[in-house]
Amino acid sequence: MNKKIQDFFLSCKECILENPRSFYGSFSLGPFKNSQSLTVANALRRTLLAELSNIAITHLEIEGVTHEYSTLVGVRESVLDLLLNFKGIALKNTSPVTKPLFGYLQVRGPGVVRASDLKFPPMIQCVDPDQYIATLNENGKLILKFRISDFKNSQENLNFEVSKTFLNIPNFGHFDTSSFQNFENSNFFSSSFFASQKMIKSKRKTKFSQLKVDYLSSFGFSTQHKRSGLNQTQKFAMQHQNPFRIEKNQQDFNKNKNGNFDSQKNKTNSLWVDPLFNPILKVNYIIETIEPMQKNIPNEIVFIELWTNGSIHPRKAFYTALLYLKTMFDKLDCMRLLNYEFSNTMLESEKTSTKFFKTFEYDFRFYNSREDKTMKSFTPEKFFLPEEIEDVEKDYLLNLKNQADNTWNDLPLTNLNLPYRITKILAKNNFFVVGDLLKISPNELKKLSGIGNYCVFILQKRFEKLGLKLGSRNEKNL
């Protein structure tokens, strides 16, 4: 068996960096038997496309944007286009990411915004700094904050709600000018940039408006306005928002005396980017025969080629997929098949259920220690369960056997399909159910009138098919 395992080989044919966001790798693996090559190739391809994960930008919060269908003044791209551009940004981390991280972007036009303008945490790097994000004209400005997370943290916080201090940017009037990309337009905060908002006054407060005030108050929103009625711009925006999304801040834009405005009064919402965590772009495989097809002789090689987004080397991605499959099958090797009813009985006790799950929990140290032993000897090792679980198993099997015995005790002999003559003779000797024969030995049965060796032989054959034995109940009592 050692010779068969040593016959396998893995070779990296070539790895080519086609562009910063496309890293190509080609590998060969084999030889396999005719029935194994397709299984291995398909398993590797599905693992590469489904099980590998990386970090990505998950949420955006853009200053002045409340929903995905908004547009920004002075920005060529719509908010949907910005979300798609951020979705395509490939990131890699120099150290493990254990919690969500945040980055920033503060630029103004005219100019082109690229990934190099983003401010990332020290442990995060952008694969392609020249990746395009947006184009701004003279009146354009783009101030946003984005969240970076891995797949695990993203699933735990899928219903992510941004706190009211998420943007956490001080008064825009006190910004350091060095934080912006371009400042050619000196009248960026001019009064013409923010048009005055017209108000619609309601003649009287109706019953419906009172219900509206009570409804909004239940969410903690302020219902006291300087003027009755809703702003036209507010009303239009609220009609086109997701009805299940609550705005982070319900206050209007207010200019201050210096022509600036307070960022705490801006309407902002966290926008879901729908990130792509898998760094694998595409996987292909080809199965080739290296010699004439022969039965049960390894003669097929699997050629696999894959493309990554540049955040991971193809060789590392391929080895990670192999390690994932190996770990999964190691679990199956150590798994113990348990009867469904036995597992239910065992899990009724909180003490045994806790130890049961801890026993089968994946532990790197456990599998590393087993790996050395497995390489030396390929005989399967016994997987031991805690003593408490073994005691529960013994009790369960004993109860199951007692229940089975009780079932056979009441089974009529007519259900055994015995010859009519034997059934009639047993009935004359007061044997009507199987439990009656379990109490008497074959020698004692032969002493009865009308029962000979042939009759005992037929009964023993019928009982063996049921897993029973003549006189077994009498032997236990002795």
UniProtKB/Swiss-Prot annotation:
GO terms under biological process: DNA-templated transcription
A GO cellular-component term linked to this record: chloroplast
CDD domains in UniProt: RNAP_alpha_NTD (cd06928)
InterPro entries noted in UniProt: DNA-dir_RNA_pol_insert, DNA-dir_RNA_pol_RpoA/D/Rpb3, RBP11-like, RNApol_insert_sf
Enzymatic class: transferase
Domain notes: The N-terminal domain is essential for RNAP assembly and basal transcription, whereas the C-terminal domain is involved in interaction with transcriptional regulators and with upstream promoter elements.
Family, per entry: Belongs to the RNA polymerase alpha chain family.
Protein name (database record): DNA-directed RNA polymerase subunit alpha
Organism encoding this protein: Tetradesmus obliquus (Green alga)
Lineage of source species: Eukaryota, Viridiplantae, Chlorophyta, core chlorophytes, Chlorophyceae
